[in-house]
Curated annotation (Swiss-Prot):
This is Cell division protein kinase 2 homolog CRK1. Its EC number is 2.7.11.23. It holds the Pfam family Pkinase. Forms a stable but non-covalent complex with a regulatory subunit and with a cyclin. The active site is at residue 127. May be involved in some stage-specific role in the promastigote cell cycle. GO terms for cellular component: cytoplasm; nucleus. CDD domains: STKc_CDK_like. Belongs to the protein kinase superfamily. CMGC Ser/Thr protein kinase family. CDC2/CDKX subfamily. It catalyses: [DNA-directed RNA polymerase] + ATP = phospho-[DNA-directed RNA polymerase] + ADP + H(+). It comes from Leishmania mexicana. Phosphorylation at Thr-15 or Tyr-16 inactivates the enzyme, while phosphorylation at Thr-160 activates it. ATP binds at residues 11-19, 34.
Length: 301
């Protein structure tokens, strides 16, 4: 079966396995092959691969990368995806971080459509970041790399908290939250929205504590009013009793929005949407579906 695909060049390493650009000899289409080696000691296919396959088979949407085929041999599993040669990180770098207001709005709408579709189907992505958002020739943005994706249909399941690249990780996960739902992706969307506006990651932390500190400085030190569940996470006591977290930071939010170039491209409505995405309390973050109906998307740029 894999002989149908002519491998051309290695284009990256995914959550696991190697990704190649290839040609489908039966259609002449360019495709991406994600190859996963199956170690003889291991029983069957890595669970991350099975998770990605089963999720993507269910998720058919224009803003989600298409899974075209799955080839399985004794030593290797090959997942065939539509080929997109550009991700949002590369796109931002190419434009020197300077996207115009209309492009930001367009990408943001695509991102939220993909995320809302996942959430409607009880699927969390859990690793949203610019490198996992692919851009087509037609400038459509699509969610890719579902290696960490997880169905959340069973309500009170404990998830592992080793998810989401640090910079796009919400404060509840930084404090060790093991039970979370769609708000984990919504926080990441907020971070990506800000990065599209300014060209720079909003919270580029070096470790969990530094990441949380950057969030505290930006949003202000939380209290039980703005974050009722803040003391209920596994690492709350440990982390929040450190001297640096006992300082009272005034929010830098309005100063940053007023002084960092790029935020003006969002308009007042875009800034309001950003604030609703980046709430401390997970249940108070706007949903992806509600975000699509936000006045920001009525703005004409």
């Amino acid at each position: 079966m894999t002989s149908r695909y002519e491998r051309q060049e290695k284009i990256g390493e995914g959550t696991y396995g190697v990704v190649y650009k290839a040609r489908d000899t039966s259609t002449a289409a360019t495709v991406a092959l994600k190859r996963i080696r199956l170690d003889s000691e291991e029983e069957g296919v890595p669970c991350t691969a099975i998770r990605e396959i089963s999720l993507l088979k269910e998720l058919r949407h224009e803003n989600i990368v298409k899974l075209l085929d799955v080839c399985h041999s004794e030593h290797r599993l090959t997942i065939v995806f539509e080929y997109l040669d550009l991700d949002l990180k590369k796109y931002l770098d190419r434009e020197n971080g300077n996207l115009d207001a209309a492009t930001i709005q367009h990408f943001m709408r695509d991102l939220l459509r993909g995320v809302a579709f996942c959430h409607q189907r009880s699927v969390l992505h859990r690793d949203l970041k610019p490198q996992n958002l692919l851009i087509s020739r037609e400038k459509e943005l699509k969610l890719g790399d579902f290696g960490l994706g997880r169905s959340f249909a069973i309500p009170v399941r404990k998830f592992t908290n080793e998810v989401v690249t640090l910079w796009y990780r919400p404060p509840d996960v930084l404090l060790g939250s093991m039970q979370y739902g769609p708000p984990v992706d919504v926080w990441s969307v907020g971070c990506i929205f800000s990065e599209m506006a300014t060209g720079t990651p909003l919270f580029a932390g070096k470790n969990d504590a530094d990441q949380l500190m950057r969030i505290f400085r930006f949003l202000g030190t939380p209290n039980n009013r703005v974050w009722p569940s803040m003391n209920q996470y596994p690492n709350s006591n440990n982390m929040l009793s450190q001297p640096e977290f006992l300082q009272n930071f005034e929010p830098e939010w309005s100063n940053v929005l007023g002084s960092v170039p790029g935020y003006e491209k969002l308009g007042c409505a875009g800034v309001d949407l950003l604030e609703r995405l980046l709430r401390y309390e997970p249940s108070e973050r706007i949903t992806a579906a509600d975000a699509l109906n936000h006045p920001y998307f009525s703005l004409q740029f």
